[in-house]
């Protein structure tokens, strides 16, 4: 019985203690009444939490202070370091001329700072200042410029490496006939005090715009050229673009006031057309007999896309037909801008002046050939590859072309070779090699004259056009020859335009005197 009573008392005590705990910690009873029951536990909990909060706050404050100190030191170093480092420049400006004789000075200028460092090495015999000036840096103060000029005048020394290849006696005349080659021996490389001053003064003007370099000088030159061109009539034609079929429709109406080419005081004119740069597609009108004001009224169509018209040129050539000789070119009309009159959506009428034909304007065709020279064997090989767009010399509108190559020396023909004849074509293909024996000592004295001939079984053969290559040639002919001499044993190929024969005596007949090339010496 006593045992059961003790268990009941203990359970009642535990329940009472549980109820008191809930009442105290739930806030339903004031804490002052409960402090006698739980004094030690609650106080220890509040003290420990307060200590943890204070220590954590101290750590955070210490870390922030350290970070602030590091940032402050970095900002101070950034702001004060350039000012402190630039102090030697102003202090050494006044003493720069006096310190030159004792130690060499190195001057550097960048986009942000200028430095003068004096090396404490013993003085050398020749003082060579190294100056590096940035084009984008601010202007140098006047004191520094004055000091630098005085220093450069006294001790500047220019070093220039001149590499001039030693020339052999074989190429003396070759170099003498090159007007484009600069004579290195005639150039004055001496540098005195005045060029140094000018160089120092011009460094400050780098980057400035010079209006005199942008003057339009082409206006006057074009006006003078237009005055020199002679007018030999007018040509009337119309232009329209067919958007559905992508065709440029050209209608040649008439020509007025053409010059007389026949003995009777008239001409037999016709017009030939190209849409440049394509020369394969061409059109030609009918020939109108004995008239200076022909009425053509013929329409032609060029297949071309509309977006390509801005890159095309319309070329008209007016010819005088001759039954027994080659046709004479009266003049030409070149329409550089097809949209000059309108957008070609409607038919536009155009009147253009016919410019008289010149030697350069006459389209006789082109020839392609290669040159190759073997100096050890003394052998030159000219390979005639092909021709294109040759002038029609026969009544049928074609030609029977062959190529004749002559080895010339001071106007005298030494040797000649020719290719086979290609029948009824204006674009012959040959691929035939012609070989001449020319020793190295005579290469500078000879040249080659290439003539495209039209074979005629009944009469005499006519010259379609000629071109020349050699040191005495002009333009592409000389450049082709020089390139052959520069690259031995390598075939050099170029297209050459054909020109009218200026005179038979100067190109194919024997004139003057020239020693024949010596045969190559056998080992």
Swiss-Prot record:
It is found in: Cytoplasmic vesicle, Secretory vesicle membrane. The chain crosses the membrane at residues 56-76. Ca(2+) 3 binds at residues 322, 325, 328. It comes from the Eukaryota. Gene3D superfamilies: C2 domain. GO terms for molecular function: calcium ion binding; calcium-dependent phospholipid binding; clathrin binding; phosphatidylinositol-4,5-bisphosphate binding; phosphatidylserine binding; protein heterodimerization activity; protein homodimerization activity; SNARE binding. It is a single-pass membrane protein. Ca(2+) 2 binds at residues 262, 320, 322, 328. The keyword Metal-binding applies. Ca(2+) 4 binds at residues 394, 400, 454, 456. Residues 231-352, 363-496 form the C2 domain. Binds 3 Ca(2+) ions per subunit. The ions are bound to the C2 domains. It holds the Pfam family C2. Its main location: membrane. The modification Phosphothreonine is found at residue 136. Ca(2+) sensor specifically required for the Ca(2+)-dependent exocytosis of secretory vesicles containing IGF1 in neurons of the olfactory bulb. Exocytosis of IGF1 is required for sensory perception of smell. Not involved in Ca(2+)-dependent synaptic vesicle exocytosis. Acts through Ca(2+) and phospholipid binding to the C2 domain: Ca(2+) induces binding of the C2-domains to phospholipid membranes and to assembled SNARE-complexes; both actions contribute to triggering exocytosis. This is Synaptotagmin-10.
């Amino acid at each position: 019985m006593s045992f059961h009573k003790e268990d009941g008392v203990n359970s009642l005590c535990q329940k009472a203690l549980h109820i008191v705990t809930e009442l105290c910690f739930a806030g339903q009873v004031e804490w002052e009444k409960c402090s006698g029951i739980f004094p030690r536990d609650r106080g220890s909990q509040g003290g420990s939490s307060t200590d943890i909060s204070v220590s954590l706050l101290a750590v955070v404050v210490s870390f922030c202070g350290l970070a602030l100190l590091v940032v402050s030191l970095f900002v101070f170093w950034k702001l004060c370091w350039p000012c402190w480092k630039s102090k030697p420049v102003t202090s050494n400006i006044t003493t720069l001329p006096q310190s030159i004789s004792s130690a060499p000075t190195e001057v550097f200028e960048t986009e942000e700072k200028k430095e003068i460092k004096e090396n404490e090495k013993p003085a050398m015999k020749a003082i060579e200042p190294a100056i590096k000036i940035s084009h984008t840096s601010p202007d140098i103060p006047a004191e520094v410029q004055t000091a630098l000029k005085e220093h450069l005048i006294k001790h500047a020394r220019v070093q220039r490496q001149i590499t001039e290849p030693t020339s052999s006696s074989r190429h003396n005349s070759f170099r003498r006939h090159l007007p484009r080659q600069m004579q290195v021996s005639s150039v004055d490389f001496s540098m005195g005090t005045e060029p140094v001053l000018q160089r120092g003064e011009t460094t400050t003007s780098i980057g400035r715009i010079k209006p005199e370099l942008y003057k339009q000088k082409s206006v006057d030159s074009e006006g003078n050229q237009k005055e020199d061109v002679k007018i030999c009539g007018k040509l009337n034609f119309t232009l329209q673009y067919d958007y559905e079929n992508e065709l440029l429709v050209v209608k040649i109406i008439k020509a007025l006031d053409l010059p007389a080419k026949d003995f009777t005081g008239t001409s037999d004119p016709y017009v030939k057309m190209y849409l440049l740069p394509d020369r394969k597609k061409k059109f030609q009108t009918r020939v109108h007999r004995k008239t200076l004001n022909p009425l053509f009224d013929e329409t032609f169509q060029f297949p071309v896309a509309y977006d390509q018209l801005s890159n095309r040129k319309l070329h008209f050539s007016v010819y005088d037909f001759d039954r027994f000789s080659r046709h004479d070119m009266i003049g030409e009309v070149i329409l550089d801008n097809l949209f000059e009159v309108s957008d070609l959506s409607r038919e536009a009428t155009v009147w253009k002046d016919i410019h008289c034909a010149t030697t350069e304007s006459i389209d006789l065709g082109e020839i392609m050939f290669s040159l190759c020279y073997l100096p050890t064997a003394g052998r030159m090989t000219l390979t005639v590859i092909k021709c294109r767009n040759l002038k029609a010399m026969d009544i049928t509108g074609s030609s029977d072309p062959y190529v004749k190559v002559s080895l010339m020396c001071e106007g005298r023909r030494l040797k000649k070779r020719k290719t086979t004849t290609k029948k009824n074509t204006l674009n012959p293909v040959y691929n035939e090699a012609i070989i001449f024996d020319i020793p190295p000592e005579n290469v500078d004295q000879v040249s080659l004259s290439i003539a495209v001939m039209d074979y005629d079984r009944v009469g005499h053969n006519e010259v379609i056009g000629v071109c020349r290559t050699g040191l005495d040639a002009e333009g592409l002919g000389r450049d082709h020859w020089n390139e052959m001499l520069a690259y031995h044993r390598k075939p050099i190929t170029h297209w050459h335009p054909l020109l009218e024969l200026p005179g038979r005596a100067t190109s194919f007949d024997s004139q003057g005197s020239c020693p024949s090339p010596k045969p190559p010496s056998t080992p």
